[in-house]
């Protein structure tokens, strides 16, 4: 007889903290993987550029950024300003484990009452997280 040990990611500690310059390389990795996934879901792959080459790179780093860290590795991040949620990305293997929600919960107190964000209509997973935090869809 043998035993199988199953270790879930959520048993590992998820730390949400402010971005540091030393996170840059890992943040780029998260962005590049998750952005491609987002664009595949949104059927807009032609818009992809790695963060190093993205026209919005300067804008992203001018925002407030928090990272999600597991075992000293950045697995997600959120970037926002007072009235706009600009970017929220989590590595695929960590999605569906509440990390995006924790990042969003960190940002919400800083957002003005009427903040906005943009999401592809086909990105159902993101829309569920946003609506669970009180965001409503406007057309």
Regions found by a protein language model. Name each.
Residues 1-22:
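Conserved N-terminal entry element of GNAT/NAT acetyltransferase domains
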Residues 78-83:
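A conserved beta-strand-loop-helix scaffold within acyl/acetyltransferase catalytic domains
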Residues 24, 28-57:
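Conserved GNAT-fold acetyl-CoA-binding loop/helix
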Residues 101, 122-139:
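Conserved active-site alpha-helix within GNAT-family acetyltransferase domains
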Residues 63-76:
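Conserved beta-hairpin
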Residues 94, 98-106:
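Conserved acetyl-CoA pyrophosphate-binding loop and the N-cap/start of the following alpha-helix
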């Amino acid at each position: 007889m043998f035993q199988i040990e199953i270790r879930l990611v959520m048993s590992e500690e998820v730390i949400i903290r402010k971005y540091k310059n030393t996170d840059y390389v890992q943040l780029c990795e998260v962005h590049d993987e998750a952005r491609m996934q987002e664009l595949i879901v949104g059927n807009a792959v032609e818009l992809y550029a790695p963060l190093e080459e993205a026209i919005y790179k300067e804008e992203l780093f001018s925002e407030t950024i928090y990272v999600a860290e597991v075992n000293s590795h950045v697995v997600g991040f959120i970037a926002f300003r007072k009235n706009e949620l600009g970017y929220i990305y989590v590595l695929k293997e960590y999605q569906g484990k509440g990390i995006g929600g924790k990042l969003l919960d960190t940002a919400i107190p800083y957002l003005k009452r009427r903040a906005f964000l943009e999401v592809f209509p086909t990105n159902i997973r993101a829309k569920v997280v946003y609506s669970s935090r009180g965001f409503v869809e406007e057309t």
